Amino acid sequence: MRVILTLALMAMTAGSAAAQDRLTPDQFLDLVDQRTASFATFPNRQPVGTEQFLSRTRTVWARANGTCAYGVVTTGDGQVCFDYDDDPPGVRHCWVPFLRDARLFVASTSDLGEVQEVIDISDDPVACTQAPIS
């Protein structure tokens, strides 16, 4: 799967001389729709969690600690945002997707400086130690 991700990312950046290219939310969702993306901190590569994109608007987020939540995906202003059913009302997690050296990343818009790398995209479902809340 990693080879497929690398080839897809290389195709998206063909002809680009920039070392870092911002992706639109739709370009990001094109890569992960109906797939599962694994996220890690950057640059330390500590596991953060795995997100199964059930559709372009619904996910199951499995944190590294094994807990899970359903998410609603929205886009706007160049951001991909997630609202999880176990967060307090009004809490949103928004990210700006980008490519750097043919690797896929997301940068937080609320926690400045937080960057995560998508280290794998697969067709495997998420594994949770508990069922999502709703």
Task: Place the predicted regions along the sequence by residue.
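Sec-dependent N-terminal signal peptides
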Residues: 3-13
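Lipid interaction determinants
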Residues: 15-70, 76-134
